[in-house]
Amino acid sequence: MKTKAFRLFIALLVIQTFLFAQSEGMVFIKGSRYIPLYGRDSTVVEVKDFEIDVYPITNAEYENFVKKYPKWQKSKVIKLFADTSYLSNWKNDLELKASEKPNSPITYISWFAAKDYCECQGKRLPTVDEWEYVAMADETTKDARKKPSYNKQILAWYEAPRFNENTIGEHQKNAWDVHDLHGLVWEWTLDFNSVLITGESRKDVDKDSNLFCGSAAVNATDLMNYAAFMRYAIRGSLKAKYSMKNLGFRCAKDINLK
């Protein structure tokens, strides 16, 4: 009896320590090995434990950032690090236009700016593998990629106009307790330009032909591949200084074991 009570005490202590250690506004992601889609020759990718923001970074959060770090204000940013669209939806260096909502995701943001924002918070941008790992969850399942309902919902979001005007948190959280990975804006990743899609890639399923030909019925795997193809295609078209209406970001963080 004493042994069971001691084990229970230790388990509760570990859980309590973990909860207190989890960074504010972030959730812990238990790493694992998984097979990503598109663009890699290796079969399995290993993702280590990490934390990720629950929500994308908002206009209000980025407004506070540029007040603290003036070099990222729209009139002061070095053009090498941001194109002419950078913060083009802002009224001036420190104010949003009246049409913009403080709690909407920040967009018109370059990779350089997003990366520096995260680093100034003691964080970093998530890698492609980390982002895809968390994003393959639906509301109940951490790998929902083979569920037709999951893939059809994502494709419906992709086919509709981007919703950068909407506020964060309107979509139900996924099984990791993360919101808005799909259906709000595209998101920068740390290594966005590390993946190229070619017909020679082992996982470029059927040389992409089934994704675009109507000769056969579209099954769950086709939808899964097509959704992934669209994400990788967007990433492959970007350059680090680009700023787009429908491109935002969130931050991640390594787990530091002491």
Model-derived features with residue positions:
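Flexible glycine/proline-enriched surface loops and loop-helix/loop-strand junctions
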Residues: 44-48, 164, 233-234
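Acidic glycine-/aspartate-rich tracts in secreted/extracellular proteins
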Residues: 57, 191-193, 256-257
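A short glycine-rich, aromatic-capped structural motif
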Residues: 22-84, 109-112, 183
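Residue-level signal for well-ordered alpha-helical scaffold segments within enzymatic catalytic domains
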Residues: 4, 8, 60, 64, ...
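Functional-site microenvironments in short loops/helix caps that host divalent-cation chemistry
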Residues: 28, 92-232, 245
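Bacterial Sec-dependent N-terminal signal peptides
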Residues: 1-23
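Short, structured beta-strand segments at or near domain termini in extracellular proteins/domains
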Residues: 245-258
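Short, P/G- and charge-enriched loop/turn segments at secondary-structure junctions
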Residues: 39-42, 175, 234-240
